From Swiss-Prot:
GO cellular component, one term: cytoplasm
Compartments reported by the entry: Cytoplasm
InterPro entries documented for this protein: Cyt_trans-like, PPAT, Rossmann-like_a/b/a_fold
Family: Belongs to the bacterial CoaD family.
The species this protein was found in: Lactobacillus acidophilus (strain ATCC 700396 / NCK56 / N2 / NCFM)
Gene: coaD
Protein name as it appears in the record: Phosphopantetheine adenylyltransferase
Length: 161
């Protein structure tokens, strides 16, 4: 059985994240989607909120389980979950180079775990949570980029109800 871990900040979860999770679900027997905390980022939503958005967006995919493990090293979590693959989404060459570095470090820390990079479709290749939050701050409709609950919560959080 191949178990994959798809970690992310998901602040908030985007259609690109959902696309990556769905692709992973087609490739692996079990996929853990985990809202984690990157200590170099400042978050708009709590870990609980980010997890709830992911659970809602992915609820109809039977081999995906959404968890919240905000502060843990990814490879340690992969071992806890018995995952032998870490899945990451890649939108562009900058993402690729960043993920290549992280994959190298992870391989050193956990030689038994492989990283699989899944490339986004052209429709999602420019969608970044940070960009979507910026659009929403200026009262732009971001519903085409986010799952429904995440879009509504973002609008409410920024008081553009």
């Amino acid at each position: 059985m191949t178990i994959a871990l798809f970690p992310g900040s998901f602040d908030p979860i985007t259609n690109g994240h959902v696309e990556t999770a769905k692709k992973a679900a087609q490739m692996f027997d079990k996929v853990f989607v985990v809202a984690m905390t990157n200590t170099s980022k400042k978050y708009l939503f709590t870990a609980e909120e980010r997890t709830a958005f992911a659970k809602d967006a992915l609820k109809n995919i039977s081999n995906i389980e959404v968890l919240e493990k905000p502060e843990e090293l990814t490879v340690k979590l992969a071992h806890e979950l018995k995952a032998n693959v870490i899945v990451r989404g890649v939108r562009n060459s900058a993402d690729f180079l960043y993920e290549q570095e992280i994959a190298g470090i992870n391989k050193r820390l956990a030689p038994d775990i492989n990283t699989v990079l899944l490339f986004s479709s052209p429709d999602n290749s420019f969608v970044a949570s940070s960009m979507i939050k910026e659009l929403a701050r200026f009262d732009e409709d971001v519903s085409q980029f986010l799952p429904i609950k995440a879009a509504k919560a973002l609008r409410k959080k920024l008081r553009h109800e």
